Structure formats: C-alpha cells, structure tokens
Amino acid sequence: MTFRDILSVTFEGPRASSSTGGSGAGGGAGTVGPEGPAVGGVPGATGGSAVVGTGSGEDNQSSTAEAGAAASGEVNGSAAVGGLVVSAQGVGVGVFLAAFILTAVAGNLLVILSVACNRHLQTVTNYFIVNLAVADLLLSAAVLPFSATMEVLGFWPFGRTFCDVWAAVDVLCCTASILSLCTISVDRYVGVRHSLKYPAIMTERKAAAILALLWAVALVVSVGPLLGWKEPVPPDERFCGITEEVGYAIFSSVCSFYLPMAVIVVMYCRVYVVARSTTRSLEAGIKREPGKASEVVLRIHCRGAATSAKGNPGTQSSKGHTLRSSLSVRLLKFSREKKAAKTLAIVVGVFVLCWFPFFFVLPLGSLFPQLKPSEGVFKVIFWLGYFNSCVNPLIYPCSSREFKRAFLRLLRCQCRRRRRRLWPSLRPPLASLDRRPALRLCPQPAHRTPRGSPSPHCTPRPGLRRHAGGAGFGLRPSKASLRLREWRLLGPLQRPTTQLRAKVSSLSHKFRSGGARRAETACALRSEVEAVSLNVPQDGAEAVICQAYEPGDLSNLRETDI
C-alpha cells in the first residue's frame, strides 16, 4: 500500500450495509460488505494511526465512531492530519525536530556565507570548515526532514526505493562530516607545529585534493548497501532503517568513526603539547625550531628615547629583557594552558559524546542481537549523532573572533566588510609622523641593533619611505601609495588578521596606561610599538634581504587554532 492509499478513502459499490475495517489495535486490511464498499485499514504496526473507512448503508450510521474508538485508544487528544491520526506527543516531537533542523540549516548557512562574503576569511583552514558546513547543511536539508517525518508518523511513507537512497545519503553526509573534523584537526596540528612552513605545506591545490579524497572515501562507505551489501529487504515497505548487516556495520563504523576519532584525539593532544611548549619558550624570549640550530627571537621595537631614570645601563638591560618577555607573551597569546585545555575538551568531548554511542551500539547489535537497546533508546542515540551537525557551527567557527564579527555583519545584512583604518590605536602622537607605524617582520642577523633604530639589513616596503623627525622615525607615503588611497601594509593580496591588530592594540594601551611605569625605562612615555622583527642567526651567510610575511601565517603570531 502506497502513501497515497493511506491518505485516501476508497468508495465502491451501491448503497448498502457495510462492515468496517481497521478495528482493534490497528486493524487489518478491511473486508467488503455484501453490497458495500471496501474499507481501507492500516497494518497493526501503525497502532493508533489507523484510517477508518465508512460506507453509506443504514447499518453504518454509528460504525464510524465505534470503529474509530476501536482502532485507536488514543484518539482523544490526537490530531488528524491529511487523514492520519497524529498523537499530541507526535506533534510535540515534530515541533522540536523542526526547530532542531532549522537551527542546523541556519548555523551552517551562516558559516558558508561568512567565508563567501569576507575575503579575509578565505584561508585554507576555513576552506576545511566550509566543507564541514556543507556536509552538515546537506545532512540537515536532505536527510533530517525525512527522518523527522518518520519519527512523527511512526512509519516510512515514501517507498522502498527512496528509503535506500535516503539511507545512502545519510551515511555519505555523516561520514563526510566526521572526516572533515578529522581533516581540521590535522590542518591545525600542521599549522601549530610547522607554522613557518605552513603556507608551503598546505596550499590551496593540496587542500582541494584532500577534500576530493575526503568525499571519495565517504562515497565508498555509503554505496555499499546500494550495491547489495545489506541484510534481506523487509517485506513491509513502510519500514525503513539503517543496514545492520554484520560486515557492513563493522566496516562503516571503523571507516566513518573509529579511525577518524583516533586521528582527532592524537592530533589535538599533540596540538596541546606543542602549544604548551611554545608558550614556555615565548616566556623565555626564544623559540627554537626543531632540528635546526637557528633561534627565532621575538623583539618589540619601541620608538622613543630608551633612557633609564637612573641612567644605569645594567638595570636598563635587565628591565628591558623582562619587558621584552612580557610583551612577547601579551602579543602572541599563543596558547594559555587553561584556555587550550578547555577548548580541546569541548571539541573532542562533543564529538565523542555525539557519535560514540551510535557507533558502539550499531556493531554490537549486529554481532549480538540480544544486546540491542530498546527502540526508544536507539532513537535517542540515533538523533544524538545528528545533533553534532547542529553544534559544529557553534564550536569551530565561533571559537574565532573573526567569524563572530562576520556572523554579526550577516545578521545585520552587512555582507561587505567595512573599510576600517588599520590599527587606530597606533595613530602616531607626534606631528612628524605622516602615516601610522608599520608592522615589519624581517629576518635579521644574529647581532643586535639598538632599540628604536631600524635594522641595517632591512629596507622598507615599496610605497613607504622612512625619514627622521621629532623623537623617532616616521613613515612618509610615496605618491604611488597616495594615488591608491589605501595604505597596503602587506601587499595587495595580504591583509593583517583581526587577532593580530587586537593584540598590537592591546600592547599600545599597555605602554600608554597601566604598563607605563614598567615601560618607561625602555621606551619614551609616548612611545608605541613600531615593529615586530625576527632575529635569525646566520652562520657565515650574507645579510638576509628583508622579506615581508603574512602575520596570520607566521608561527605563534596568531591565537591558537584549537
């Protein structure tokens, strides 16, 4: 019997007394009166959702009410929708699932539109997050509505063929979502562990190849039941469920969950270890790259007269070293152990909580049918995995301030990013400065230069030239940069990240306010952060030509991506 037959009542034959079908707990297929119509019923599995047929004979005046009462003991408090009797509990479940689905769709759409409408968010890491959002959006829009319909009605009304397709798409989207989480964990480990080489390691072409491989693996896992790797088809077309064939249940559980879970746990544990060691190195003022003899020293150049109140060079040197270490920690904020532990607990904990119960029960129930949970418990476990697709947009993108700002702009219908002046907190206080100070990242030889003076091995970027004036060095824009009407700090295709601007702004406020007492021995009272440079020792090599790097791609110059 098709879904259309369930929603319709068939009338046949002339007027005469008729008998009713569908009595009892769901009824049977109905019977035909001597001269009356056939009455459609619903199998006993549908319980109180039976449809009562009526005739037109004299004996049928009270048959409708009697048969309806016999067909369902819960008719009172139920709603009839399209000829189907839906209980009040089913209506409540439907409303809850509808809100759940709409939340998942809206959250994943926000992630996709945020990256599409903001060029500064179009990075390789965010491409993986967008892929996660696409998988979750496809699951929310193409799978969950039919799953919710089956939960409300109590049976599958869409036929056997569509059931097989729905189950395959379900496995495809869930597997792609989990593999996307796995890919994000690997990408963030590479970004933290080898961040100086990250732009060369994780290019857009490699990212596209990884995403193509990800969907190929998900497709291989999902097409098994369509090719016959499943248990025998049940005779009742109104039943639709996941395949519990032993071999496929184990294969899909291992490929879709257990292997990705192992990778996720290992990668995030490594991220935490590397972040903690990096934080300790930054507190000491030196960051050592593994397997290399060179040292990377973060130094904050302060504009102004670097004179001590007492004129003691030794005291000035010691206090300057302390200031350098504290500023390094405040600038980078790479990985505070408590924050990293909290973030990792949320990421790994939510993933395991949502998916582990389902992938534990599925193979266990296939191997040992007597250990299967009850139907109600299995439904909760089944939808708990879907819940992960709803919370992913909250965990991963919302851990970034840039994504939060992009969400707010989208909600305010401000798709285009406003042109804001870079680092307004670093506006030069002296009239001799024509432009704002530049943030330069230059590899330098091992010897040190006096603070406040430019390195002899570094040249300014095109479009900016230095001149002496007032208490320090300023920047005077060239004619070409004025014609462009936009001061490009990092080149036409590179923009400083929001996190880095906020960090430098915080440092500037420290110099001017509460930290002035500690900073007065190293910087003038009105000094500001002029540059962040990398001191890289070169053994026997010539001076390194100044190169500009993307701050967001440099090791430890962005907040931890965990």
Curated annotation (Swiss-Prot):
<keyword id="KW-0472">Membrane</keyword>
<feature type="region of interest" description="Disordered">
    <location>
        <begin position="50"/>
        <end position="69"/>
    </location>
</feature>
<keyword id="KW-0449">Lipoprotein</keyword>
<feature type="transmembrane region" description="Helical; Name=7">
    <location>
        <begin position="375"/>
        <end position="399"/>
    </location>
</feature>
<feature type="topological domain" description="Cytoplasmic">
    <location>
        <begin position="400"/>
        <end position="562"/>
    </location>
</feature>
<feature type="topological domain" description="Extracellular">
    <location>
        <begin position="368"/>
        <end position="374"/>
    </location>
</feature>
<feature type="topological domain" description="Cytoplasmic">
    <location>
        <begin position="270"/>
        <end position="342"/>
    </location>
</feature>
<dbReference type="Pfam" id="PF00001">
    <property type="entry name" value="7tm_1"/>
</dbReference>
<dbReference type="GO" id="GO:0001994">
    <property type="term" value="P:norepinephrine-epinephrine vasoconstriction involved in regulation of systemic arterial blood pressure"/>
</dbReference>
<keyword id="KW-0675">Receptor</keyword>
<feature type="topological domain" description="Cytoplasmic">
    <location>
        <begin position="187"/>
        <end position="207"/>
    </location>
</feature>
<keyword id="KW-0564">Palmitate</keyword>
<dbReference type="InterPro" id="IPR000276">
    <property type="entry name" value="GPCR_Rhodpsn"/>
</dbReference>
<feature type="region of interest" description="Disordered">
    <location>
        <begin position="444"/>
        <end position="472"/>
    </location>
</feature>
<protein>
    <recommendedName>
        <fullName>Alpha-1D adrenergic receptor</fullName>
    </recommendedName>
</protein>
<feature type="topological domain" description="Cytoplasmic">
    <location>
        <begin position="116"/>
        <end position="127"/>
    </location>
</feature>
<feature type="lipid moiety-binding region" description="S-palmitoyl cysteine">
    <location>
        <position position="413"/>
    </location>
</feature>
<feature type="glycosylation site" description="N-linked (GlcNAc...) asparagine">
    <location>
        <position position="60"/>
    </location>
</feature>
<keyword id="KW-1003">Cell membrane</keyword>
<feature type="transmembrane region" description="Helical; Name=5">
    <location>
        <begin position="246"/>
        <end position="269"/>
    </location>
</feature>
<comment type="similarity">
    <text>Belongs to the G-protein coupled receptor 1 family. Adrenergic receptor subfamily. ADRA1D sub-subfamily.</text>
</comment>
<dbReference type="InterPro" id="IPR017452">
    <property type="entry name" value="GPCR_Rhodpsn_7TM"/>
</dbReference>
<feature type="transmembrane region" description="Helical; Name=4">
    <location>
        <begin position="208"/>
        <end position="232"/>
    </location>
</feature>
<feature type="region of interest" description="Disordered">
    <location>
        <begin position="13"/>
        <end position="44"/>
    </location>
</feature>
<dbReference type="GO" id="GO:0008217">
    <property type="term" value="P:regulation of blood pressure"/>
</dbReference>
<keyword id="KW-0807">Transducer</keyword>
<keyword id="KW-0812">Transmembrane</keyword>
<feature type="transmembrane region" description="Helical; Name=1">
    <location>
        <begin position="91"/>
        <end position="115"/>
    </location>
</feature>
<feature type="transmembrane region" description="Helical; Name=3">
    <location>
        <begin position="164"/>
        <end position="186"/>
    </location>
</feature>
<feature type="topological domain" description="Extracellular">
    <location>
        <begin position="1"/>
        <end position="90"/>
    </location>
</feature>
<keyword id="KW-0325">Glycoprotein</keyword>
<keyword id="KW-1133">Transmembrane helix</keyword>
<dbReference type="GO" id="GO:0150099">
    <property type="term" value="P:neuron-glial cell signaling"/>
</dbReference>
<comment type="subunit">
    <text>Interacts with FLNA (via filamin repeat 21); increases PKA-mediated phosphorylation of FLNA.</text>
</comment>
<feature type="topological domain" description="Extracellular">
    <location>
        <begin position="233"/>
        <end position="245"/>
    </location>
</feature>
<dbReference type="InterPro" id="IPR000363">
    <property type="entry name" value="ADRA1D_rcpt"/>
</dbReference>
<dbReference type="GO" id="GO:0004937">
    <property type="term" value="F:alpha1-adrenergic receptor activity"/>
</dbReference>
<feature type="transmembrane region" description="Helical; Name=2">
    <location>
        <begin position="128"/>
        <end position="153"/>
    </location>
</feature>
<feature type="compositionally biased region" description="Gly residues">
    <location>
        <begin position="21"/>
        <end position="44"/>
    </location>
</feature>
<feature type="topological domain" description="Extracellular">
    <location>
        <begin position="154"/>
        <end position="163"/>
    </location>
</feature>
<keyword id="KW-0297">G-protein coupled receptor</keyword>
<comment type="function">
    <text>This alpha-adrenergic receptor mediates its effect through the influx of extracellular calcium.</text>
</comment>
